[in-house]
């Protein structure tokens, strides 16, 4: 499998930010890591090998980047306003740095990636997707949480509202973003298990909000033996690649 690593200094995040790509060409998928992990996490946990059929045959090309979870949501020493500032900066990094890089890497065509994330990465993927639906063709959200108020120690602000998908989606009124989500042909896949450390209520809540807004989506709730762990994600992600990019 072709594998290339690039990095550049991000003025938004004040640090070098690496990005790894897998495959030669094909529709792009932007993969955001779980919790405190880094851009090579999907490779270390052997997920990329399960996608070789698509990545080696030009059916898809995958990109993975670092997150800011250790600076933001998972940083217990940081005040809520600072956490939200990091999330805003990360949103700018993804939309104004990573997406242009992917476009250039794909030959300059106006590509719209699928964005994917697992666990806290699913939150990051959902947030950038629902805030900028015109920039993406779909989202694959695995075992995620879509309400970050539990990380905010009771803090309330406009910045929290606009970075909390269950809030701003529930109140989304007729407008460009809602029409894009309703009629833009997006593929939204929400996955959860019901086993150890999974919380299917979070995925059902997001799906319920999308349904109430007439936003097409797919909710997959797997069994009570399906835990919040890599063996199950290695099983479901190839299935979703098959749905998105063909077998």
Regions found by a protein language model. Give the residues of each.
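Non-catalytic cap/lid and distal C-terminal segments of serine-dependent acyl enzymes
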Residues: 1-247
């Amino acid at each position: 499998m072709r594998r290339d690593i690039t990095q550049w200094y991000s003025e938004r995040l004040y640090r070098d930010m690496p990005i790894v790509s897998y495959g030669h060409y094909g529709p792009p998928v932007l993969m955001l890591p779980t919790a405190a992990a880094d851009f090579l996490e999907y490779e270390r946990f052997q997920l990329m090998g399960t996608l070789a059929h698509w990545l080696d045959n030009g059916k898809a090309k995958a990109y993975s980047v670092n997150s800011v979870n250790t600076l933001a949501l998972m940083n217990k020493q940081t005040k809520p306003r600072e956490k939200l500032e990091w999330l805003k900066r990360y949103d700018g990094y993804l939309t104004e740095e990573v997406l242009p890089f992917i476009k250039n890497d794909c030959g300059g065509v106006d590509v719209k990636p699928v964005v994917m994330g697992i666990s806290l990465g699913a939150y990051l993927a959902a947030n950038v997707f629902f805030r900028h639906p015109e920039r993406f063709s779909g989202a694959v959200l695995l075992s995620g949480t879509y309400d970050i108020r539990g990380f905010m120690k009771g803090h309330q602000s406009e910045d929290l509202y606009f970075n909390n998908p269950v809030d701003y989606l529930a109140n989304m009124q007729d407008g460009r973003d809602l029409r894009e989500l309703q009629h833009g042909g997006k593929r939204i896949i929400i996955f959860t298990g019901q086993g150890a450390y999974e919380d299917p209520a979070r995925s059902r809540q997001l799906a319920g909000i999308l349904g109430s807004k007439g936003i097409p989506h797919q909710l997959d709730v797997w069994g009570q033996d399906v835990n919040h762990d890599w063996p199950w994600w290695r099983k479901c992600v190839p299935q979703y690649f098959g749905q998105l990019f063909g077998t």
